[in-house]
Every structure is written in C-alpha cells, then in structure tokens.
A protein has these predicted regions:
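Glycine-rich phosphate-binding loops of nucleotide-dependent enzymes
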Residues: 18-271
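Short, Lys/Arg-enriched N-terminal segments with co-localized hydrophobic residues
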Residues: 5-16
Length: 271
C-alpha cells in the first residue's frame, strides 16, 4: 500500500493551501428559494471533512452538486484544477472521485470478489455485458482491495448472506476501484449499530492515511462526526455558518443554537 503522499497544509485566510478540492461561491435554488447560498470550502489530501447541518440546511444539495447529480446555478467546484460543474457523474468518477451511498447496495447474486471485479471492469471501459467472458478480470486486484477493507476472507461468499456492516465494507472496496483521489460518503453509518459505525469509520481513517485520500462525508450522528472528522463545516438555511476542528464546532454558540436552541450544548465525549 502506498504511503501517504501529501500532507495537510496550514490554513491561510480560512482556505486550505494546496487543496485537492476547492468549492467557491456555490449556489442552487429550487422554485426561487435558495437551497445553497454562496458557500465556499476546501478539502486537502489526507483529510476527512464532515458536512453537517439540521434538516433543510442544504448539505444534501451541496453534496449532490459535488458528485454531479445536481448542476450548480452559480459557483465553481474544482478538483485539482479541473472544473466539475456541468460534468456528469460518470465523468466525475473518471476524474478520480469515488462514492459510497446512504443505503449500500451490491449485486446480491454475485460473490464479494465478483462485485469488486465488476467495478474494475467498468473502470477499464469494458462493457458489463462482457462479464461472463471476463469472470476472472483482475481478480488479484479485487482481492487486494478486499484485503484493505478486511473482507478478503469472505471473497467467495455471495453478497446476499453478508451482515450489513460487511456490505458497507464491500461498498467501500468498490468505491476504491477507480483509485480515487477524493471519496464522497453519503451518511456512511446510517442504519448501523454503534460498534459497526466505529469500525467502518476507523477503517475509512486508515484508508485516508494509507492512500492519501481526501474524504467529504455527510453524517447525522454527531458522535461519529466529532470522533472521526478532522474538520467540520456547518450549514444552516443554505449558508455556511461555521467551519473548524471538532472541538471548535462542539463549543460554537451559533452551531449549538441551530441544533438545540438556546441553553443546550452537545454532550461531552466520555472519558
């Protein structure tokens, strides 16, 4: 496994120097109502950035503009100097962006390793209809990806017998098939027990360190956010209201007010 190639640079003027991803003045409206109103943020290699906010804050809209499912009305999304606004999700994937989904899905009739092989087949521009003739396509590479997520021992099991936490691990291996620079994770721990949540996020953290990934993730569990994010951006009513390290966000009065109203705070982590 390649060692971490980049280091997170220092902050300067609220922006990250040598950023992999640069989002600038991003905006999106629906029916004349601004869902996202001019937000800007950066993301560096080797960093996990959490995008959070209460319901209706604009985080899903922002996330879907970055992954290409929605077109921005204004602003820019630059990945290593390449504009992503207006690009289709497939083109963004080819640019080096991996993704996991809130509800993990695999081909239930295929084995664990075959699911990853299918992703590699697609990455290599081979038609999925060729699968029967290419059933051994890059099997060793698929097994190596599964080894990174702790699923190699279950490589030949059908996906429909896996526990949900293991399906999430397979999905993570699939997301690595295009050797991404940026990984987008939509509610990665949704529907998981606390132990499974921690295992998945610890694994993600390891992949960030091993591969030099940049990770942007949305998440409702504040325990997960505070435990695993290197930095957090908080949206409310389409605007970015706070940005900083977990402890700074935990103690931020405006963030506390948005989530709880006045007089309440986030629970402190147990010793």
């Amino acid at each position: 496994v390649a060692a971490l190639a980049w280091q997170i640079d220092a902050f300067h003027g609220g922006r990250t120097m040598s950023a992999l991803l640069q989002v600038s003045h991003l905006g999106k409206s629906f029916g004349g109502v601004k869902a996202v109103d001019g937000i800007s943020f950066d993301l560096a290699p080797g960093e996990l950035l959490a995008l959070i906010g209460p319901n209706g804050a604009g985080k899903s809209t922002t996330f879907n503009m970055v992954n290409g499912q929605l077109n921005a009305d204004q602003g820019s999304i630059m990945l290593q100097g390449q504009e992503l606004v207006g690009r289709k999700p497939r083109d963004i994937w080819r640019q080096g962006v991996g993704r996991t989904f809130q509800i993990a899905e695999t081909f239930a009739s295929l084995t664990v390793v075959e699911n990853v092989q299918m992703a590699l087949l697609s990455h290599d521009d081979l038609l999925l209809s060729m699968w029967r003739r290419a059933a051994d396509h890059r099997r060793d590479d698929a097994l190596a990806l599964l080894d990174q997520v702790g699923m190699k021992p279950q490589a030949d099991r059908p996906c429909n017998v896996l526990a949900y936490g293991d399906v999430k691990r397979v999905e993570l291996a699939i997301a690595m098939a295009n050797d991404p620079k940026l990984l987008l994770m939509d509610e990665p721990t949704a529907g998981m027990a606390p132990k499974e949540r921690n295992e998945l996020m610890a694994l993600t953290k390891d992949l960030v360190l091993q591969r030099g990934l940049a990770v942007l993730f949305t998440e409702h569990s504040m325990d997960v956010v505070f435990a695993y994010a290197d930095r957090i951006i908080v949206l409310a009513r389409g605007r970015l209201i706070a940005e900083g390290k977990p402890q700074d966000i935990r103690d931020h009065p405006q963030v506390q007010a948005v989530y709880f109203g006045t007089g309440k705070t986030f629970e402190k982590p147990s010793a």
